[in-house]
Amino acid sequence: MVNHKNVKKMIKAIAKRTLINKMRKSKTRTAIRKLVDIIKSGNKENVTPAFRSAESNLHKCVSKGVIHKNTAARKISRLNAKVKALMTA
């Protein structure tokens, strides 16, 4: 058991931050999944807003320190390539 007040506070703060980070990651994964589903269906009208949403969520995760910037850049690049392939097809 912890003996210091600040340790108890930090445990609560870490648990809260972990929950928020999980929510952000989940929201981002959902946006990416929706974009991939739209790409697979071949719907060209809805692909741009879905891509913007996924890209925005990834950038927010980077700015909040949830994921690394290179990871986000790689995912955005791969999603963008899929979107371009759909638009040119």
Curated annotation (Swiss-Prot):
InterPro entries per the UniProt record, alphabetical: Ribosomal_bS20, Ribosomal_bS20_sf
Keyword RNA-binding: yes
Gene Ontology, cellular component aspect: cytosol; small ribosomal subunit
UniProt keyword list: Ribonucleoprotein, Ribosomal protein, RNA-binding, rRNA-binding
A biological-process GO annotation: translation
GO molecular function: small ribosomal subunit rRNA binding; structural constituent of ribosome
One Pfam family of this chain: Ribosomal_S20p
NCBIfam families: S20
Function statement: Binds directly to 16S ribosomal RNA.
Family named by the database record: Belongs to the bacterial ribosomal protein bS20 family.
Name of this protein: Small ribosomal subunit protein bS20
Taxonomic placement: Bacteria, Pseudomonadati, Pseudomonadota, Alphaproteobacteria, Rickettsiales
